[in-house]
Amino acid sequence: MIYKFYDTCSLLLNYQHLFEEEGVRVAISSITLQELEEIKSSFRKDAEIKFSARKLLHVLEDNRYKYDLLVYKPAMLARLFETHVFEETNDMKILACAFHYDTYVHPDETVFVTNDLALQTSANLYFGEDSITSVKLG
C-alpha cells in the first residue's frame, strides 16, 4: 500500500481521479479542510475555483472511508521548528501533519503530493526527493 498525503492545491487539481488508484490510500490534514471551506466562500476567489472546492468537499464526503484525516495539533509544527526555521503558515501546518503521518502512522510509506514549489522544497528536508510527488495539469 502507498499512502499519499495531499496538500490543498494538489487536491483541487486531482480530485476527479483521487480515489481511482489501486493500492493507494489518500491522507489529508484538517488544515486542508479549513482551506477548502474558506475557498468555497471567499469573495476573492473566482467562480471556477470555488466550484472546484465545493465539488472536492462532496467527493471527500462521498468517500469518507477511503481517506485518512489527520487533525493538526501545534505540537506537530513544533517538531519541524526543532530542526529548521519556518514561518507558521498553513502550508507548514499541512507539512507538519504529513511528517507526523509519515513518522507515526505509516513510517516511510508516505508520499507527499504537492504542486507548490516552495512547499516541495521545504518537504524535501523531511521526506527526501523520492517521497515527494508533484501534481501537474494535463
PLM features per residue range, with description:
Residues M1-V111, N115-G138:
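Active-site-proximal, substrate-binding regions of enzyme catalytic domains
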